[in-house]
Amino acid sequence: MLISIAFLLVLCLLNYSSFRMLKSFLTLKKISRYAYLGFFILLSAGEATFVFYRNVMPSHLFVLTSACSFVSFIAFVFSLSFYGFSYSVEKIDFLPSRRKGLKNFLRIGFYLALLGYFWRGFYEGLARPKIKETPIYLDKLDKELKIILLTDMHVGSLLQKDFVNYIVEEVNQKEVDMVLIGGDLVDENIEKVKSFLLPLNNLKSTHGTFYVPGNHEYYHGIEPILSFLNTLDMTILGNECVHLGGINLCGVYDYFARKRQDFAPDIDKALKKRDSSKPTILLAHQPKQIRSLKESHSIDLVLSGHTHAGQIFPFSLLVKLAQTYLHGLYKHSGTTQIYVSSGAGYWGIPLRFLAPSEIAYLRLLPKNQA
């Protein structure tokens, strides 16, 4: 609760700052001033509603109120930029007529930049995810292994059965050895999305489909979600490990649940039955789960999602601070690598900026082929 309140206070501070910065440079009539004030009040009210009632509100309100935090951050970034330019113009020794002309130019530029930002953001957000191929070289691997990593599909009120069907069709074209679903598959009460998820039974691969939950599964009821997913043609790796395709494939529950009594991540338990002669792949929703690794764990590759590659720049800079790894393949330490997918779907409004969605196609190759 304290974290939620702190998060809300930060958002309200951003809203207040944006309000003050823009107000000092925008010329508003009386009616416009009330509308301007009302916009920021509604924005803060939406954020408060989301923070305190997100687990019980209807899906359409969840999407609407969650989007308010994105709007606050974007408004703050643009307001700060506009304020900085306008303040500089005021301080430079221009002729009054030139200063006025430059301020008008900046104002028009601000509106055009804002329009272009949202146009590009919605274009990327609504675009269907494309397959992105990445080669990864591993020690102790005998032969090539082809993997599809699906994360952050966020199946719910906006991303429904047609979206899942598209994903399945794209995946099946690659004829891979296994399909891994790295969490945040469900973003709605499971009773409302069961039919949307049924096409996942049509995923084709040599060894099958494997899944770990993300934080959004906990938001919407982890037990009923896992109960339903157990009826589908997939294996849930909840702190468990399987041996197939010449690797140890291990999975853990999400980092979000680390303080829970049940469905909490336990890396030691997940690795208990692995074969040390084979490379070990750990499927964990959040990249920062890697901070829990010890040298003795000897993980070769961690596969994660959660970040959406930041979803909207420059929000991605804050995500990187929180998660360390944002998107793509990284060398963590020693022999441990981590791949973070940008995700196939989106959270909140369909907006992505400089963070396109993806279906990650990972070609695991013996290191001697590098």
Curated annotation (Swiss-Prot):
Binds 2 divalent metal cations. The keyword S-adenosyl-L-methionine does not apply. Belongs to the metallophosphoesterase superfamily. It comes from the Bacteria. Its cofactor is a divalent metal cation. This is Uncharacterized metallophosphoesterase jhp_0380. A divalent metal cation 1 binds at residues 152, 154, 184, 308. GO terms for biological process: lipid A biosynthetic process. Coiled coil: none annotated. One of its GO terms (molecular function) is UDP-2,3-diacylglucosamine hydrolase activity. Disulfide bonds: none annotated. A divalent metal cation 2 binds at residues 184, 215, 306. PANTHER family: PHOSPHODIESTERASE YAEI, TRANSMEMBRANE PROTEIN WITH METALLOPHOSPHOESTERASE DOMAIN-RELATED. It is an enzyme of class 3 (hydrolase). Its EC number is 3.1.-.-. Gene3D superfamilies: 3.60.21.10. GO terms for cellular component: membrane. Keywords: Hydrolase, Metal-binding. SUPFAM superfamilies: Metallo-dependent phosphatases.
